[in-house]
Curated annotation (Swiss-Prot):
One of its GO terms (molecular function) is ATP-dependent protein folding chaperone. It comes from Corynebacterium kroppenstedtii (strain DSM 44385 / JCM 11950 / CIP 105744 / CCUG 35717). Gene3D superfamilies: 1.10.8.60, ClpX chaperone, C4-type zinc finger domain, P-loop containing nucleotide triphosphate hydrolases. Residues 1-54 form the ClpX-type ZB domain. This is ATP-dependent Clp protease ATP-binding subunit ClpX.
Length: 422
C-alpha cells in the first residue's frame, strides 16, 4: 500500500515537471500527463495565434457595391451618383486589402493594386460627412475626422498631420492592426488651397505646406505617431502606423470652383454648333465636369490631386430632398424627436406645411441638411421643457405658422383628444 502511495506522489506533468501535489488537476494520457496550468497556457497561445491570423481578419464578408448603396440609401437621401462612386471605391479598397492578406488570392503576375483615395466635392450641408460616417459604420472600421484648416506644417503653431493618425488610433482603442484598416475623413480641404496659382517664394504653412505634408500619408507610409499628441511630450515612445491600407476621404465645398470649370468649358464651347445652357444648369452640373486642371487652378497642387483619383460630387439639396431628409431615413430628425417625446407619453405631429417651411428656412440660411436640427431645436425646445410637467398633454402639433411666424405649437390634452374623437 505504501509503495502505491509513493508511486502516486511521483506522477508529474510531462510539460512543466510539476508533481501531482503542486497542481490542482493532473490529466493522464497514454504514457504522458498534463496539468491544468499547462492546459490554460496552451489555450492562451492558441487564442493569440487565431486572433492574429489573416483568416480571422477577413472572415467578415465584404458587402457588394449594390449592398453598400442600399445601406447608404437607408440613411442618406438623394446623392445617388455619389453613393455609387463611393460604393465602388470602398468595395475595391477593401477587396484589395483582403487580397493582400490572403496569399491564395495573389496571382502569379504579382500585380500590386494601388490605393484609391476619394475626393468629395459639394456644398455645405449636402451630406458629405454623413456619407463617410455611414460607410464606416456599415463596414465596422475605425473612423476619424479632422478639419484641414487646423493643420499646419511640422514646426509651426497648429496640428501636425500625424495628429490625424492619432485620432484614428484613438478610435481603434490603440489597436494598430484595426487602425490600419480604418477611414480618415479630412473636411474643408478647399481651405488649404494655395493662395496663388503660381508657386510663391513665401512660406504658405497652412495651405500648400499642408498639402505637401499630407502627400506621404495619403500615398502610404509607415508614420511615427506620438500617442500623447506630439509637441508637448518630445520624449515619448512613438507608435508605428502603416497608412498603406487606410482609406482617406478628402472633402470640401470648393466655392468658386464652378466658375473655373465654367471658364474652361466656355472656351471649349465657343463657335457654331456649341451647346448653349443656362447659367442655372451650369452651376448645378458644374462639379460633374471637374477635371484635374480645374482643381490645380483652384489651388490644389498636382501631386495632391494625383493621390485622390476617385472624385465623387454631391449636389445642393432642394426643398423636396430636405423634407425627405427630415422624415424618411431610419434615424431621421422627425423620428428622433418623436421618440424623445414618446418617452414622455406624447405624440409629435408635424404638418406638411411645417416640414416645407423648415426646408425653406434651411435653404434660406444656406446650411442645407446640417441646419435642420437647429431649426427643429428652436421650435421644439420650449415644448420639450414644458411637456414633462404637463401630465395631461398627449400630442404636440407643429404647424407652418410655428416655423414662419414663431407661433407656439399646439398642445392637445387627453380630454381635448377625447372630445375631438367623439
Amino acid at each position: 500500500m505504501a509503495g502505491m502511495q509513493e508511486s502516486a506522489d511521483v506522477l508529474k506533468c510531462s510539460f512543466c515537471g510539476k508533481s501531482q501535489k503542486q497542481v490542482r488537476k493532473l490529466i493522464a494520457g497514454p504514457g504522458v500527463y498534463i496539468c491544468d496550468e499547462c492546459i490554460d497556457l496552451c489555450n492562451e497561445i492558441i487564442e493569440e495565434e487565431f486572433d492574429n491570423s489573416p483568416a480571422q481578419k477577413t472572415d467578415k464578408a465584404l458587402p457588394k457595391p449594390s449592398q453598400i448603396v442600399d445601406f447608404l440609401g437607408d440613411y442618406v437621401i438623394g446623392q445617388d451618383a455619389a453613393k455609387r462612386t463611393l460604393a465602388v471605391a470602398v468595395y475595391n479598397h477593401y477587396k484589395r486589402i483582403q487580397a493582400d492578406e490572403n496569399d491564395h488570392h495573389k496571382s502569379d503576375d504579382d500585380i500590386e493594386i494601388a490605393k484609391s483615395n476619394i475626393l468629395m466635392l459639394g456644398p455645405t450641408g449636402s451630406g458629405k460627412t454623413y456619407l463617410a460616417q455611414t460607410l464606416a459604420r456599415m463596414l465596422d472600421v475605425p473612423f476619424a475626422m479632422t478639419d484641414a484648416t487646423s493643420l499646419t506644417e511640422a514646426g509651426y503653431v497648429g496640428e501636425d498631420v500625424e495628429n490625424i493618425l492619432l485620432k484614428l488610433l484613438q478610435a481603434a482603442d490603440f489597436d494598430v492592426d484595426r487602425a490600419q484598416r480604418g477611414i480618415i475623413y479630412i473636411d474643408e480641404v478647399d481651405k488649404i488651397s494655395r493662395k496663388s496659382e503660381n508657386p510663391s517664394i513665401t512660406r504658405d504653412v497652412s495651405g500648400e505646406g499642408v498639402q505637401q505634408a499630407l502627400l506621404k500619408i495619403l500615398e502610404g507610409t509607415v508614420a511615427s505617431v506620438p500617442p500623447q499628441g506630439g509637441r508637448k511630450h518630445p520624449n515619448q515612445e512613438f507608435i508605428q502606423l502603416d497608412t498603406k491600407n487606410v482609406l482617406f476621404i478628402v472633402a470640401g465645398a470648393f466655392a468658386g470652383l464652378e466658375k473655373v470649370i465654367g471658364e474652361r468649358r466656355g472656351k471649349q464651347g465657343l463657335g457654331f454648333g456649341a451647346n448653349v445652357s443656362s447659367k442655372e444648369e451650369n452651376e448645378l452640373d458644374a462639379f460633374s465636369y471637374v477635371q484635374p486642371e480645374d482643381l490645380v487652378k483652384f489651388g490644389l497642387i498636382p501631386e495632391f490631386i494625383g493621390r485622390l483619383p476617385v472624385v465623387a460630387t454631391v449636389n445642393d439639396l432642394d426643398r423636396e430632398a430636405l423634407v425627405r431628409v427630415l422624415t424618411e431615413p431610419k434615424n431621421s430628425l422627425v423620428k428622433q424627436y418623436s421618440r424623445l417625446l414618446d418617452m414622455d407619453g406624447v405624440t409629435l405631429t408635424m404638418e406638411e406645411g411645417a416640414l416645407n417651411a423648415i426646408a425653406d428656412k434651411a435653404i434660406e440660411r444656406g446650411t442645407g441638411a446640417r441646419g435642420l436640427r437647429a431649426i427643429l431645436e428652436e421650435i421644439l425646445g420650449p415644448v420639450m421643457f414644458e411637456v414633462p410637467d404637463s401630465e395631461d398633454v398627449t400630442e404636440v402639433v407643429i404647424s407652418e405658422e410655428c416655423v414662419t411666424e414663431g407661433a407656439e405649437p399646439r398642445l392637445i390634452s387627453s380630454t381635448e383628444a377625447e372630445r375631438e374623437s367623439a
